[in-house]
Amino acid sequence: MAFQGTSRTLTQQSSAASSDDLQKILFSPDAIKKMATECDLGRHHWMRADNAISVRPLVPQVTSNNLLSFFKSGYDAGELRSKGYMSVPQVLCAVTRTVSTDAEGSLKIYLADLGDKELSPIDGQCVTLHNHELPALISFQPTYDCPMELVGNRHRCFAVVVERHGYIGYGGTTASVCSNWQAQFSSKNNNYTHAAAGKTLVLPYNRLAEHSKPSAVARLLKSQLNNVSSSRYLLPNVALNQNASGHESEILNESPPFAIGSPSASRNNSFRSQVVNGL
């Protein structure tokens, strides 16, 4: 038998040279660029009327070709126990709308296996988001590792599928989907506990809350005006103190001013709910 004893990592199973080859396949500048341009890893994908169905593989075709050749050569030489598997613990998608809340439409998002000609959701993990529900975070957890193989002329791997429904009269972008994942490749595989697709509705970012506390505005104005040497620029309600040392003590003893829009001002806004911003 080619392998005996306890389970080992891919690096332990293969030579250092082949491990370096695998690193080059996955992390070369060209591979990283392809992950962005072909797979939209960490990038915002716009859902438009002329792109109502989007299928984004989690591995670029060139990388799939290189991985398939790498594992096959190692398997044929007796150095690896299989022709390779792709493992993705979780896919996380941040979804935001780019039209008003009264627009009638929805998005259907799920994870599929490109080896399935019908592109059905894996284990029924599928999420439908109506426009008025956005923004939202969704997640998928495949229950198996995907073999690195060719099915007909298709490279088999996991893919994020997004379908746009409705939005009559809206020809442009109605939603933005930003997907993140971390693919792993190994010569061994496993099955995993089934979990339903995650769906978390997120509060829209309340940017008005940063400007709604008068005390924050007052502190900002006070800090700006008190920097001027002339006493006529002091706020009317601030007691005039001719003693320079006492004035310095007054400034030092009070809380430092927080600029509107600064992180400190945001932290001191006690009634703000936790939100996701900048997706």
Swiss-Prot record:
Transports viral genome to neighboring plant cells directly through plasmosdesmata, without any budding. The movement protein allows efficient cell to cell propagation, by bypassing the host cell wall barrier. Acts by forming a tubular structure at the host plasmodesmata, enlarging it enough to allow free passage of virion capsids. This is Movement protein. Residues 263-279 have a biased composition (Polar residues). GO terms for biological process: transport of virus in host, cell to cell. Belongs to the cucumovirus movement protein family. It holds the Pfam family 3A. Disulfide bonds: none annotated. It is found in: Host cell junction, Host plasmodesma. InterPro entries: MPV. The keyword Transport applies. It comes from Cucumber mosaic virus (strain Trk7). Keywords: Host cell junction, Transport, Viral movement protein. Residues 255-279 are annotated as: Disordered. One of its GO terms (cellular component) is host cell plasmodesma.
